[in-house]
Design a protein with these regions (language model features):
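A detector of low-complexity, intrinsically disordered, Ser/Thr/Gly/Pro/Ala-rich segments
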Residues: 11-13, 159-160
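Glycine-rich beta-alpha loop elements in corrinoid/cobalamin-binding modules
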Residues: 48, 52-164
Length: 164
């Protein structure tokens, strides 16, 4: 109504879906960062992240490898978000763990989920690799991360800890 103050709540945490930075001059895409180089580069789009990014209205998908984005540049982008979903692979896992540390340095309260092949095959080891990883999703993650983004905002509007 005109002239009436209204409170509008976001439907979910502001979420960044991230295909993280790759290695310099390394090839990658389709959910992997290959430990090899070629004469030409080819990057598949981050298809796995498109569905959940499309479902949450206040989210963004950032495909870092084709942009040649560094971890520093990525952390600067991530500081504007409350929740980051990192699609990790086996070859890039340790680099992604270091990125998670950088994200927490920039914004300590940010929530970080790791998804993808590495956490699927090594869930316990992945979760124990760093305290900076808040949780992992072992299987199909698209609905799980959307549900977390929506429910966490309702359960912890002022921030807080999710046990698990």
């Amino acid at each position: 109504m005109e002239g009436e103050d209204r409170l509008v709540l976001s439907e979910a945490m502001k979420t960044l879906f991230l295909n993280p930075p790759s290695f310099e001059n390394f090839d990658g895409g389709a959910g992997a960062r290959w430990p090899a180089t070629r004469e030409t580069e080819s990057f598949w789009y981050a298809a796995e992240l498109t569905y959940p990014a499309g479902v949450l209205s206040d989210s963004k998908l950032r495909d870092a490898p084709p942009r040649k984005a560094t971890s520093t540049q990525t952390a600067e982008v991530a500081r504007r978000y409350d929740f980051v979903v990192v699609f990790t692979s086996c070859v890039g896992f340790q680099s992604d763990v270091r990125l998670a540390r950088r994200l927490k340095d920039v914004k300590p309260e940010i929530k970080i989920a790791f998804v993808g092949p590495h956490v699927r095959v090594q869930p316990t080891e992945s979760l124990k690799a760093s305290r900076d990883i808040d949780f992992i999703v072992r299987a199909e993650f698209d609905h799980a991360v959307v549900e977390f983004a929506r429910q966490a905002l309702q359960l912890f509007p002022q921030g807080g800890t999710v046990l698990g």
